[in-house]
C-alpha cells in the first residue's frame, strides 16, 4: 500500500526510522518529530523481545521450544510468555471462536508440511527444476500422504491449557501467530511512541498500517476532502446487530490517502482509501488499515500422486489447506476511545479471517466493541458484472467525470458500507 498526506500535513511526518527485516517484512516509522536514539533503541529491543517469544522462525524462540520435545523437557511443559502476550492470546481466543476454528495458532505444523518453514526463500516460485529440494528456485516441495508426524500435537487452540500469558503442553505443538501477531507488535510499538508525547506518526509493517491521531495544530492548516466513499449495493455486507457508523471525513481532520495494491500487480491499485485522522482525545487510539494477500508467499507443492498445486501461507485451519477464491483483503479499524486497545492486531487478524470465513459471520461473531470495515476481492466475476480493474496509483486513467476509469478484470469486490475507499468499479 502506498501512502500520501494532504496539504501542510504532507511535510509533517518527514522523519524516518527504519527497522529492516524485522517481523519478516521490515518496518518503517515516519514521524512529525525525530524519534530520539534512546527511544529507537527501546523500540528495537521491544521488537527483538517480541520475536524471541513469538517467532516461529527463530531457533531460540519460546514458540520454537514448544514444538521441540527437548524444549518441552527443558521447560517442563510450562511456557511463560511475557505478560504483554496475554491480550494477543485473548484476541486469538476471540478469532478462534468467531471463525469456528478456522483461525488457529496450532496451524504451524500444517504450514511446515506445506513447505512454509525455515528458510522459506529456498522454496522459491515458478516451474519445477531437476535439483534437490531447496537447492534451486521453483523446486516443488513434496508432501507425504500422512499429515502430522507421530507424537505431534494435532488438537486446536482451545485444547491448550492457558493461564494468562502462560501456556502448558506436554506434547510438541508448532504455533504460528502470523494471522494477528505482526499487527499486535505494531500496536505495542505505537503505544510506546504515543507515551513519548511527541508528534503524529505512521507505522508501516509490510502492509499493516497504524496511523496515530493527528495533533491539534493540524486542525487549521490541513486541506480537507469530501467523503470519497463509493457505494456499491451489490457488494455491500451489512451488520444487522451493530449501528452503522459513518466514516465521512470531517472538516478539521487530517487526511491520509492509501493506494490499495492490486494483488496480482504491485504497480497498480484497485482503489484509494481515505483515512481521516482526528485530533487526539484522551484515551483515543489511532487508526489501523491492514491488508492480506498470498501473492508474495506462494510456492509449488507436489502431492503424493505427483500432481502439482500452488500453495500459499494463508490456510484454513480446519482443513490444513490454502484458502481459495479470495485474492486479497483489507480491514479498516477506525480510531476509537474504547474497546479497541489493539486496533492493528484486530485488523490484521480479521484480514486473514476474511480468507476463510464469511464476512457477515465475522460481524455476528466478533465482540460488539470491535468496530471494523472491510474490502475483499474474490476470484473471477459474475457474468455481466463489471469488476475491479488495476490502475496506476499515480497515473490512473480517468473517465469523463474525473474518476479513475473502470474496466473488466479478474476480481469481484465485496465490502462493508463504511469502508472509506473509492473502489475502481462501476
Name what the model sees in each region.
Residues 1-426:
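Mature catalytic core of soluble alpha/beta enzymes
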Amino acid at each position: 500500500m502506498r501512502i500520501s498526506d494532504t496539504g501542510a500535513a504532507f511535510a509533517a511526518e518527514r522523519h524516518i526510522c527504519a527497522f529492516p527485516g524485522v517481523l519478516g517484512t521490515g518496518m518503517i516509522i515516519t514521524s512529525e518529530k525525530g524519534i530520539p536514539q534512546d527511544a529507537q533503541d527501546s523500540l528495537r529491543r521491544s521488537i527483538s523481545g517480541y520475536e524471541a517469544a513469538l517467532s516461529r522462525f527463530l531457533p531460540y524462540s519460546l514458540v520454537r521450544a514448544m514444538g521441540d520435545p527437548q524444549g518441552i523437557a527443558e521447560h517442563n511443559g510450562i511456557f511463560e510468555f511475557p505478560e504483554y502476550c496475554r491480550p494477543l492470546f485473548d484476541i486469538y481466543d476471540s478469532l478462534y471462536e468467531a471463525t469456528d476454528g478456522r483461525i488457529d495458532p496450532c496451524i504451524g505444523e500444517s504450514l511446515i508440511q506445506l513447505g512454509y518453514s525455515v528458510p522459506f526463500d529456498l522454496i522459491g516460485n515458478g516451474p519445477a527444476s531437476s535439483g534437490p529440494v531447496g537447492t534451486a528456485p521453483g523446486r516443488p516441495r513434496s508432501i507425504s500422504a500422512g499429515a502430522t508426524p507421530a507424537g505431534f500435537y494435532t488438537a486446536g487452540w482451545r485444547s491448550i491449557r492457558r493461564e494468562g500469558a502462560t501456556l502448558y503442553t506436554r506434547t510438541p505443538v508448532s504455533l504460528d501467530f502470523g494471522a494477528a501477531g505482526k499487527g499486535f507488535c505494531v500496536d505495542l510499538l505505537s503505544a510506546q511512541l504515543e507515551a513519548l508525547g511527541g508528534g503524529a506518526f505512521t507505522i508501516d509493517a509490510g502492509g499493516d498500517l497504524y496511523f496515530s491521531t493527528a495533533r491539534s495544530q493540524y486542525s487549521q492548516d490541513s486541506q480537507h476532502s469530501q467523503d470519497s466513499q463509493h457505494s456499491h449495493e451489490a457488494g455491500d455486507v451489512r451488520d444487522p446487530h451493530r449501528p452503522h457508523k459513518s466514516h465521512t471525513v470531517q472538516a478539521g481532520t487530517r487526511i491520509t490517502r492509501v493506494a490499495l495494491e492490486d494483488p496480482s500487480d504491485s504497480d497498480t491499485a484497485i482503489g484509494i482509501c481515505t483515512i481521516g485522522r482526528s485530533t487526539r482525545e484522551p484515551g483515543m487510539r489511532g487508526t489501523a488499515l491492514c491488508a492480506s494477500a498470498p501473492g508474495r508467499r506462494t510456492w509449488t507443492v507436489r502431492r503424493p500422486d505427483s500432481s502439482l498445486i500452488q500453495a500459499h501461507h494463508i490456510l484454513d485451519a480446519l482443513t490444513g489447506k490454502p484458502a481459495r477464491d479470495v485474492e486479497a483483503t483489507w480491514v479498516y479499524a477506525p480510531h476509537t476511545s474504547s474497546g479497541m486497545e489493539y486496533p492493528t492486531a484486530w485488523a490484521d487478524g480479521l484480514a486473514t479471517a476474511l480468507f476463510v470465513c464469511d464476512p457477515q459471520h465475522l460481524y455476528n461473531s466478533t465482540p460488539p466493541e470491535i468496530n471494523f470495515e472491510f474490502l475483499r476481492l474474490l476470484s473471477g466475476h459474475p457474468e455481466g458484472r463489471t469488476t475491479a480493474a488495476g490502475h496506476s496509483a499515480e497515473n490512473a486513467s480517468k473517465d469523463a467525470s474525473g474518476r479513475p476509469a473502470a474496466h473488466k478484470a479478474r476480481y469481484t469486490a465485496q465490502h462493508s458500507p463504511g469502508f472509506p475507499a473509492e473502489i475502481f468499479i462501476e
